[in-house]
């Protein structure tokens, strides 16, 4: 039996809270209500179920009357929460860089920080580039801070990350970024990992979502503009290492490309559905360059649509 599909885009925040009864901020509640029909995109596919899993998601299904045996165990959810933390991505990229040993790869400055000390100011001063700081669990630009100085504002933000979530990720901020893209996967029950395809998207400086291109894989690879053989090597690495993880479901690994052609191979790992996978499903269903209204027209709220091949979430206010 497939679970009813639900669009719970607040799931990353629910993972941070780690409670069964979680209520997201009112604006996010409105977004989830306005965009509820977006779940129709994946309800009859292998992705049927929630956008993302957490204790709060499990409780929501219980309240819908779903039998306990159809829901994941609390132990599985605890492991998913660990995997979904950006702390896990820090360890993952460290191993990736050590194994692949390719000068085209970035990410060596990415690290996990669980305390602040007087030497941090010195660490800032020896670099001539800004940093981006991210809390362990957040989405679409929330829980993100970009700074080039260890000033009072930055210290306050970082102390907030430490107090609320126990740490943060520190990485170089790539001002010369020219492209956001991702590799999308599905991990099966037998540990076999399917490569679903590439996705190309646009995000703001602080990571807020803009749009995804709904195009063929050939068009997306051309947009990415990286040696296909190198992409295949990177994809094979991810498939192999995802097969070792105690998880079943969709995975998206976000990356970026800089102006000189270097690649950050793992900005973060999303162990849930994402807009890139939706873009793949929509291309399969409607083709490239399509225009579709995915949720009801909303003159005073959120709506999801594809406009001339760009999948986006729009907010309108009268």
Where are these regions (language model features)?
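Extreme N-terminal starter segment of soluble prokaryotic enzymes
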Residues: 1-4
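ATP-dependent carboxylate/phosphate-activation module, predominantly the ATP-grasp catalytic core
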Residues: 185-237, 270-295
């Amino acid at each position: 039996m497939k679970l009813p599909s639900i669009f719970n885009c607040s799931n990353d925040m629910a993972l941070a809270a780690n409670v069964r009864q979680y209520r997201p901020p009112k604006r996010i509640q409105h977004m989830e209500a306005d965009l509820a029909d977006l779940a129709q995109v994946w309800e009859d596919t292998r992705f049927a179920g929630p956008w993302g899993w957490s204790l709060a998601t499990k409780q929501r299904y219980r309240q819908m009357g779903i039998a306990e045996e159809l829901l994941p165990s609390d132990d599985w959810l605890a492991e998913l929460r660990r995997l979904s933390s950006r702390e896990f991505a820090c360890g993952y990229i460290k191993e990736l860089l050590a194994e692949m040993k390719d000068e085209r790869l970035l990410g060596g400055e990415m690290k996990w920080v669980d305390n602040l000390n007087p030497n941090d100011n010195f660490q800032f001063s020896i670099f001539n580039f800004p940093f981006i700081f991210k809390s362990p669990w957040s989405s679409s630009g929330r829980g993100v801070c970009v700074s080039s100085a260890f000033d009072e504002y930055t210290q306050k933000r970082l102390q907030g990350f430490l107090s609320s979530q126990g740490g943060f990720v520190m990485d170089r901020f790539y001002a010369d970024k020219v492209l956001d893209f991702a590799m999308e996967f599905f991990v099966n029950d037998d540990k076999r990992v399917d490569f679903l395809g590439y996705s190309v998207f646009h995000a703001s400086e602080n990571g807020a979502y803009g749009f995804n291109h709904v195009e063929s894989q050939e068009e997306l690879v051309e947009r990415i503009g990286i040696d296909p053989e190198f992409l295949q090597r990177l994809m094979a690495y991810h498939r192999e290492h995802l097969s070792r993880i105690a998880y079943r479901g969709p995975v998206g690994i976000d990356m970026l490309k800089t102006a000189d052609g270097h690649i950050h191979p793992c900005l973060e790992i999303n162990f849930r559905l994402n807009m890139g996978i939706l873009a793949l499903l929509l291309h399969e269903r409607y083709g490239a360059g399509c225009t579709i209204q995915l949720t009801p027209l909303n003159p005073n709220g959120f709506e999801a649509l594809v406009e001339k091949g760009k999948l986006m979430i729009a907010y309108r206010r009268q």
